């Protein structure tokens, strides 16, 4: 499947913005986890805190991976435009379907983690 260069570039920029938002969200979530940690010493709470800390680390790593892939896609689009600038906004390129799927999967998993953390915090704060 093909997509216009302009449209794919715009979508990649949107993915970059989303990843920046999720990075900020992770910082907020880490702060909340630390807050719960400082107020509770129960074994059950400690185990869940460790779980959330590990999950947030994994999600941060995944954000870094996705950001790198998005940047590579943008660089490839820009290189294609520089190589042949004639009618660049009307040309089509191979769509980034796999990358789009990766972003969507990340968002689904991240949002599930966020809901799980909110439920946990409601119980222990």
What are these regions (language model features)?
Residues 1-125:
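Charge-rich amphipathic alpha-helical interaction elements
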């Amino acid at each position: 499947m093909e997509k216009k260069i302009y449209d794919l570039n715009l979508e990649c920029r949107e993915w970059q913005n989303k990843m920046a938002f999720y990075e900020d969200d992770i910082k907020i979530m880490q702060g909340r986890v630390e807050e719960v940690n400082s107020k509770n010493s129960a074994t059950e709470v400690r185990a869940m805190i460790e779980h959330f800390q590990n999950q947030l680390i994994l999600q941060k790593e995944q954000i870094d991976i996705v950001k790198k892939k998005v940047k590579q896609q943008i660089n490839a689009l820009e290189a294609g435009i520089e190589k042949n600038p004639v009618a660049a906004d009307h040309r089509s390129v191979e769509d980034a379907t796999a990358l789009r799927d990766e972003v969507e999967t990340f968002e689904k998993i991240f949002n599930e983690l966020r809901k799980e953390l909110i439920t946990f915090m409601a119980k222990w704060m």
